[in-house]
Each structure stands twice: as C-alpha cells, then as structure tokens.
Amino acid sequence: MGVFDYRSFKGEAGKALYSDALALTLYAYTPTGQPLASGWTAIGAERLGYQGKVGPQGTFFGEQPGFTSAEVEVLGRYDEAGKLLSIGIAFRGTGGLGLSDTLGDIKNNLLAAVGPVGYAANYSKNAFDKLFASVAEFAKAQGLSGQDVLVSGHSLGGLGVNSLAELSGEHWGGFYADARYVAFASPTQGPGDKVLNIGYENDPVFRVLDGTTFNASSLGSHDKVQASATNNIVNFNEHYASTLENLLPQSILNPLSWKAHGSAGYADGLNRVVDSAFYDLTSKDSTLIVSTLSEASRGKTWVEDLNRNAEPHKGSTFIFGTDGSDLLKGGRGNDFIEGRDGNDTFRDDGGYNILLGGKGHNVFDLQQSLGKFSVVNDGDGTLYVRDAYGGISMTRDIGALVSKEPGFAWGLFSKEVTHSVTDQGLLAGNQLTQYNHSLNGDAYGNALVASVDGDWLFGHGGDDVLRSDKSDVTFVGGAGNDVMYSSGGGANTFLFSGAFGFDAIHGYQGSDKLVFMGVAGAGQGYDYTQHLSQSGQDTLLSVGDYAVTLVGVAPDSLSAGGIVFA
C-alpha cells in the first residue's frame, strides 16, 4: 500500500507515477524547452500538427477568449531508440508570463467557484479543445493509447486535470478516458477514482469546492472527505504551528493560510513522504504530518499533530522531519516518526510507536524518570522502550535517552539526565543502567529459552524456536517462520513487525497480548475478525501478507482488547 496508490499503480509503481506527475507539474511553472532529468522532453506544436498560440519555450496558451491566460505543456518520454513511450500533459497553475496572465488566471479561479454551472468541469475543453484533439491524433499515429498519457497540474492546473478527466469519455473520441490523472492542490475533485487528488489538508485552495460546487464551507475550513483525495496530509509550517496566527480563521481569504499552497512546499514535503521507510504503511486517508519549518524554527517548534481546522484524525499518525535538526513529538496514540538527517529530538506520550532517528546524533526525551520505563537492546540496532502502561516504542539510530529525575529541594525541582546508548547499557556520567534482561538470536535459526520473569526473547532472522515457562515474557520472533511456546503465567506479549513470516504460538492465553507494529496492510483499525479462520483445533490470524497460528485456540477466545495493530 501507499498514500499515493492509484488504480493499479501500487507501492513502487505508485511512487514512480507520483514522481513523474510532480516533475511535469513543476516543469509547467518553469518551462525551458530542454529535456528533464527524468527523461521528459517537450513536444512542439509543429510535430503535433497544431496551430495556435505557442510561447518561446513551447508553452501552449488557451484558445478561446476568456481562456487565453491558460497554459499547458506537452512532453514525451522516449526509449533509447527514440521511440515515443508516453505523453505528459501538464497544466500550469495560477500565474503566467506577466500580470495580464496572472489576472486572467485569477478570473478563471473565481468563475470556477461562483461562475456559470459547469465552468470548472468544462475548463479544459474551453481552453484547449483543438490542442487535445491534435495530441490525441499524434499519439495514435505513434501507436499510443490513452493509457500512455499522464495528466498533471497544481492549483488551477489541478482543476484542469480534473476537468479533462471528467470530459474524457465524451470528447476527443474518448481517447483520454483511460489516461492517468494526478492533480496537486486542486480546488475541484472529479467523481470516482479517475483522478488522484493530492493535497495538504491545511492548504486553503485544496478541496475548496465540494466537487465543483461552491458552498458555505468554501470560505472557511473545508475538510470534508473526498473519495479521490488524500484527506489528512498536514503541511506543518510556521503558520500551522502558531497559536497566535490561528486566532484568525483558516480561510482562502486569509493570506497566512496560503503558506501551505506553494508548489515548492508540495515538492519538498511530499518527496520526503515518498522516500520514507514508512511509505508502504500509509494509505490514502492516513494522517501524515510533514514538517516544512524553516531552519530557524526547527530548533524551537515541536512538530506534532495539532489537528487544527480539520475533522478529527483517526488511526496511526506519521510524522516526517526534515534534513535538519528537528523536534518531533508523537501523541497518546500510535505514531511512526522519522527524523532523517540532522540531530533530532523525539518525544512521545504513549501507545505503540516506531521512531527512526536517521543520521546524526538523535535523542529520545522520555519526559519522565527512567525508572518508569524498561529499556531493552535487541543486539541488532533496535532499542525497545516500554512505558509503565505497557506501550512500546521501537527505536533505531537513537544515541541517547533523556529522563527527568528528582533534583534538589527533596525532588521538588527536577533535572534532565542524558543516558548514552551503549552496548552494555545506558550510561549517564559514570553510572551505568543495565538493559532489561533479554536473549538475542542472530540471522539463523535459534533456540532460545527465557530465564527470568519479564524476559525478552529476540529470534531475529531464520526460523526460531522461542520457549518460556516464566511470566510476563515478550516474544519477538523477527523474520522467518518462528514457533513460540509459553507455559508460564502472567501476561505475555507476542510482538510482530514488518515481514514477520508465518509463526505459530503454543500456550496462548486470554491474558496475553498480540502486538503487530509496522506490518504493511494491517495498521490501526485493522478488523482482525475478517481475517480469522479455523483449522482443526487451531486459529489462523492473517495479518497483511503473513499469519500467526494460535495452536489449540478457538477463534471466539480472541478479543479486541488482546490484539494491537499499529
């Protein structure tokens, strides 16, 4: 899965389609007539057999009066032999080669909102009817079909994308009916899944119209879920972070709100989403918080889900830092936080979380005494931090933990203590705090037996056998097909993450907990009851592409309170 999945373009294919669409969109703002690094090259009017107004860099201008400020680029991608493989159509957003073009675009934006019925839907035909007919004939002569065409654009350009998609079945001989459509920051959204509408939740232009209809919410916060749109991506900029600035209403009439709209901010933030290790865990309606803070703000502003001017966010939260030094903060729910480059500081208020520090010296600020946590090192680069309520944070590339310990005046005042992460334990000055006891396997099949209550068993790679007759043991089989035996008391935890394989558990009890973290296709809200099956006396729980067999357990023995999906 992935937040930019579109039709059959899933995972890596969805990423590639997004990248092509963004490259075309950015080119439309700064056309040069020169080939792009991504392989796209402008196709000129002469080659298309088109007669109309064309700019010096090959930009096509609107054909009818009232639409002459509209601009579109037509590009092609070729193989090494020079054969045309695909065509890209990129609508430019508001702003052109002069004041008159910009004013014309503003007029079209206004008419799309409050003008005649159908103005937005018919925009592409009114502006470029003859051009799109020429492109269709040219493409067919080259052996291409509509499936070989990608249409993109930002802002007013996104409106053009949605317009072309809506008209595609009944115009230009239906050639564009099967084209691919990816729009950024579009004020409109076509019906169904014909277009992937990508935008920031706090962009006042994105989804400003309900479909193509202006309504009461258009001038204020407009966060209605749209079927074709990414609905919960937040551009975390200075305006979004400011309590003072948010005393003014979120509105397309508020100039401060427009900080989330620029195409450069789209490229910078969304490219980090695509590059993220968490990408395959996201979906179209995932809550994504993307920092676009300036360098001056990063060291004093916590990036977190403020859920401002929006419908309540649901499910896990994904937070993406910059390549600078960020302050990144999760909430009480389940969070996936990625620091990337720089010396980042992480906080979290509970739940089941995955924190990836990235490069630099990164710190996890516990905000409480170290004694309220148990910390385990799996010997393979992951530090597990369990809080007093049972929540678990899996962390990588964290160089230190910071705790808040009693200070002077009989503990009335607290002090921060930094504990460096070492192979032996957590080192604060000359004081070493041992990690919670664990047994760590390797990349091959291991047989591990718990030796103390509260033990952790890490199988890592290979097909492992993990056994325990102790209580409150945490089993982490890792990759491979693992078998786990539990005959002790207490509440044991069976933790699965990533591509964990096909595992079996013997001795599962109702007091135990099954925890699935970072398993593609099985995030928070996963309805496990739809993925249970019984085989003889056993229960099979399918989770994403993998499964756990609970030996000797009936399906009705499981309850939602004993299973965590994060």
Go through each PLM region and give its residues.
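Glycine- and aspartate-rich repeat motifs characteristic of hemolysin/RTX-like Ca2+-binding segments
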Residues: L293-L366, G371-S393, L401-A504, Y528-Q530, ...
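Serine hydrolase/lipase
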Residues: G2-V3, L84-S86, Y123, A133-L150, ...
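Short His-Asn-centered micro-motif
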Residues: F91-R92, S152-G153, V182-S186, D348-D349, ...
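Short, exposed beta-strand-loop hairpins at the edges of beta-sheets
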Residues: T549-V553
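A conserved cap/lid and substrate-binding interface adjacent to the catalytic center
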Residues: G44-L150, W172-D178, Q189, R308-A310
